[in-house]
Swiss-Prot record:
This is Small ribosomal subunit protein uS15. It comes from Thermosynechococcus vestitus (strain NIES-2133 / IAM M-273 / BP-1). The lineage of its organism: Bacteria, Bacillati, Cyanobacteriota, Cyanophyceae, Acaryochloridales. One of the primary rRNA binding proteins, it binds directly to 16S rRNA where it helps nucleate assembly of the platform of the 30S subunit by binding and bridging several RNA helices of the 16S rRNA. Gene3D superfamilies: 6.10.250.3130, S15/NS1, RNA-binding. The gene is rpsO. GO terms for biological process: translation.
Length: 89
């Protein structure tokens, strides 16, 4: 279940650090967060879709690793990002 191109482009434009940035940690985490939201909604309807559940757990793990990397290298940017995304209460 991939993101639509226009949705992905909008996320990139919102979270990019500079004009040509498409793959910074911030952008990657924002894209993964959107995919997690979509998969969570899918799994609310399709409770027995275990393949998607496994994919969701894999995506959550990838986002967790990226957030840990960002926290180690730039804690201030990490804090700003999680506030903007509304994750981790």
């Amino acid at each position: 279940m991939a993101l639509q191109h226009d949705v992905k482009q909008e996320i990139i434009n919102t979270y990019q650090i500079h004009g040509t940035d498409t793959g910074s940690t911030d952008v990657q985490v924002a894209i993964l967060t959107e995919r997690i939201k979509q998969l969570s909604e899918h799994l609310k309807v399709n409770k027995k879709d275990h393949a998607s559940r496994r994919g969701l757990l894999k995506i959550i793990g990838r986002r967790k690793r990226l957030l840990a990397y960002l926290y180690r290298h730039d804690p201030q940017r990490y804090q700003q990002l999680i506030e903007r995304l509304g994750i981790r209460g």
